[in-house]
Design a protein with these regions (language model features):
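Helix-adjacent hinge/juxtasegments
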Residues: 66-104
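Short, contiguous alpha-helical
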Residues: 2-3, 13, 17-31, 36-79, ...
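Secondary-structure transition/hinge residues
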Residues: 35, 99, 103-106, 150
């Protein structure tokens, strides 16, 4: 008698997108918690201001998504925002673009190995996870800044 093994893929593209967008919602609330001047100027221990860290996140989101989708790895093109409202406007536009673009990634691209931006050789899914991990890491720096400013950061588990 043969035993049949069923494998269920619980890491669907929709789950990955939902997970990523959950983190993006928390990061957006983190950006919003900063006073305008502190967002662009305050830093601790020689680290960059949070606005610079957010700009790095912004410069990764769509290039990673498009690169995984197409295999073409192009740098982000856009002007760096100079105000909190401009930064949030770019963030929100990317959130919408991510919702539109992510579902078009061909399923096979998640498991294909590629070299993103000529430097990271990994599967498409791992590249996306790298982008998410980078956001979490930098948001953690933002939490330290907020606490140093006497501001309670948003709860990281509230992703809605």
């Amino acid at each position: 008698m043969a035993t049949e093994v069923m494998q269920e893929n619980v890491e669907t593209a929709a789950n990955v997108l939902n997970h990523w967008q959950g983190h993006r919602r928390v990061t957006r609330r983190t950006i919003d918690a900063f006073p305008e001047e502190k967002l662009f100027q305050f830093a601790v221990g020689g680290m960059r201001p949070f606005a610079d860290l957010v700009w790095e996140m912004i410069r990764m989101v769509m290039p990673i998504t498009d690169g995984v989708a197409t295999g073409k790895w192009e740098e982000f093109k856009g002007e760096k925002p100079e105000t909190k409202s401009e930064l949030l406007k770019v963030w929100d536009a990317q959130t919408k673009a991510l919702d539109e673009r992510f579902p078009t990634i061909p399923q096979h691209r998640f498991s294909e190995v590629d070299t993103a931006f000529g430097q990271w050789t990994m599967t498409g899914l791992a590249t996306i996870q790298y982008g998410i991990d980078n956001e979490i890491h930098h948001r953690g720096q933002g939490y330290v800044y907020l606490r140093a400013l006497g501001i309670e950061p948003p709860h990281f588990w509230e992703r809605d």
